[in-house]
Each structure stands twice: as C-alpha cells, then as structure tokens.
Amino acid sequence: MKWYKKIGLLGIVGLTSVLLAACNKSKASQSKEDKVTIEYFNQKKEMDATLKKIIKDFERENPKIHVKMTSVPDAGTVLKTRVLSGDVPDVINIYPQNMDFQEWSKAGYFYNMTGKAYLNHLKNHYANEYKVNQKVYSVPLTANVSGIYYNKTKFKELGLKVPETWDEFVKLVEEIKAKKETPFALAGTEGWTLNGYHQLSLISVTGSANAANKYLRFSQPNSIKTSDKILKEDMVRLNLLADDGNQQKNWKGASYNDALVAFANEKALMTPNGSWALPAIKQQDPKFEIGTFAFPGKKTGNGITVGAGDLALSISAKTKHLKEAEKFVKYMTTARAMQKYYDVDGSPVAVKGVREDKNSPLQPLTKLAFTDKHYVWLGQHWNSEDDFFTATTNYLMTKNAKGLADGLNAFFNPMKADVD
C-alpha cells in the first residue's frame, strides 16, 4: 500500500476514534446531566443502614434519580436552622404532631399532598390525623405506641392475669405486692418517660384526646381545680404508680436507662413506656419473655394507646425536583419498601400489605395502631411539653393534689390566649 494511502487510512481511523470518543463523552455527560439528585433529610439516625438499602432499591428501579440522604446529630435543630434560612431539603422526615411542622405547613414551606393517590396506600386514612387547615402535608409511614411492658414469664409463674379493665389493673398491682414482688420500674428523673402513662390516664378519664385537651388546653385560664371530677380520676390512676411499695428502690433518682435495666433484671414486673423502649430492653438480655398491654379502660375492650407519626415524610414546596421527590415518597408508601423497615424497626407500619410479626412483644399495642383506639399525643396542640412532664413527676413524688392543679394551670395558661 502506498504511503499516502496508509496515511489516509490512519487519518480516517484516527478521526473515527476521536469522533467515537467525543460521542461517548457526550453521552456520558448527557447521562450525568439527565440524572437528578434529590436530598432526603432523615431524623431516624438509628435506621440509617436500613434506609440506605431502601434508597438503593429505589435507585435501582429509578436509575435517573439519585437520593442523597442527610443524617446528622441533633437533626431537629439543624432542620429548624435550614428551614428558617430557606434551605429546605427536597424530602424531609419530620414529626407531624410537632408544633414546628404545623407552623411551617401553615407558612407554606411544605408541598400540599391532599388527594394524592399514594395516600390510599395508608391504613384508615392515617395521613388525615395530621392535617393542617384541612390539607395533608405529611405521609406518616410508621407510628409509635405506648402502654405497659410486663414480665410475661413471671406472670405465668405467679398466675397473674393481664388486666382488661382499670379495676383489674388495680387488683393486679395488689396481687403482685401480695406475692412479694414490685409492680413498677419508674424513672423519677426523666418525666418524659411517664408522659405516655399520664396522657393515657387523661384520655381514658375524659373519653378521648379531644376531650382531654378541651379540659387541659382549651379551657379558661386557671380552670383546672382539685375538686374537678376529671382531675380526681386522673390522680387515682397516677396513684397506682405513686403509692408506697409500687416502685423499685431508689426510683426517684432513676434515669430512663435505670428503669429499663430494673425491669430487665426483674426488679419490677411492669414498666410504662413506648415502643421505642423495646430495643433498649432487649439489649439487657432479659431472661424472660417480654409482653405488653394497652392502658385499660373502665370496661373490657376499651384499652387504648397513644403515639404519633415517626417515619413521616414531607416535601419542600420549593423543591426543583417535585416529580422525583414525589416518586420517592410514593415508593416509600409501598409494602416492598416498608417491609425492610419494619423487619428492623418493629414499630407499627401504616402502609398496607406489610407483614407484621404476630409474636412481637408489641403486638397487643400494634393491633390498636391506626384505629380509633390509637390516639395522637395531646402535645399536638401544645407549644411545649417539658413542664407537663415536671408536673407529672412532681405529683408522683409528693401526691400533692394542689401542686398538680397549680402546675398544670401554670403550664397551660400561657397557651390559652386563643381561648374565647
């Protein structure tokens, strides 16, 4: 072959290579440009590993969407700073019972999801529990529940029966003491641990969460009195924890962890707490079967639990990638996504089709979840909670009725500016 033909051929080959390389580079660049990144802000840090797996599954099904998960310490404070500075993540795990969520929804920070088809994937229209001005801004995928943990093995040994009514609960405590056992493990230094029990007491006495808040939050200032029938019945229920001999030794100085360790080490046969406590109890490797029961009502079948949305998702109203953000939220409302979550977390799942462990210690509470016996925390309509926790523990330590009434009035009075 003549040299100029060789040069011509080499030139064609070289040009072809350059064109192919440029074409491939262009395709790669175009592919990269086509891929959309959305940010998911997570507050369930203990579930990071599981959520990463779920996100990978989503990305596999949606190769043009990349989900960047943000999970930081003190997530609530970080989120507040970002929202108030206008830097709202595309998809946010935010607790819909919190006042921040409600105020930010009213202020237009979140996308209105009212009427979206994926809301039908939730049990009993659960998203409606957290409507703000009759609009849905949150998709609550899981919830927590609260009740009474008990030593199932010891109950069987001693012939003790799980109470179905309040009177049976009182009788049970007396039977436990008669058998030289301690009824309750309590955390006197951390009032939030008794929040569930006290709220369940008030809901049970008044008949509903709305009625309880009507008495506490939406009544006239200084209207809570020791002579009130409601407060008297509430104190009867608090006294079941407060009466001498009903708690483990040194309970007044006990922390949350101390109370769970006391229960796990069989220093007490019961402890009031929420679903979040189960992993911590199991970490103590108790040598007995753990059980739970709902807060007993006045009649059989009236047991109740209280809790709220836990893994709950909102979308920024100003996201630049609404289509992709909604696609991710929709995916999270599927059983294939939430089955993986439930298998690790164990909390009640609002998504239809998730197979629940019928042998879970939480099953007696889980079966009430997302029904009319699963109330949302009363604090959904409060602007704070800490002083309520304090009023509860102060009463348990002193059994001072006037102190409880005064403490509740002092806590709720500043919120009542909107009460006619």
UniProtKB/Swiss-Prot annotation:
Which InterPro entries has this protein been placed in? Bact_solute-bd_prot1, SBP, SBP_1_CS
Has keyword Repressor?
no
Q: Which Gene Ontology cellular component terms are annotated?
A: plasma membrane
The main location class comes to membrane
Write out the annotated subcellular location. Answer: Cell membrane
Single Gene Ontology BP term? transmembrane transport
Q: Which domain of life is it from?
A: Bacteria
Please state the span of the N-terminal signal peptide per the UniProt entry: 1-22
**Lipidation, S-diacylglycerol cysteine type:** C23
Lipid-modified residues of type N-palmitoyl cysteine are: C23
UniProt keyword annotations, A-Z = Cell membrane, Lipoprotein, Membrane, Palmitate, Signal, Sugar transport, Transport
Q: What induces it?
A: By raffinose.
Bilayer topology reads: Lipid-anchor
Q: Pfam families annotated for this entry?
A: SBP_bac_1
Q: Which SUPFAM superfamilies match?
A: Periplasmic binding protein-like II
Keyword Repeat (UniProt): no
Q: Which family does it belong to?
A: Belongs to the bacterial solute-binding protein 1 family.
Briefly state the protein's biological role. Involved in a binding protein-dependent transport system responsible for the uptake of melibiose, raffinose and isomaltotriose.
Protein's recorded name: Multiple sugar-binding protein
Q: Which gene encodes it?
A: msmE
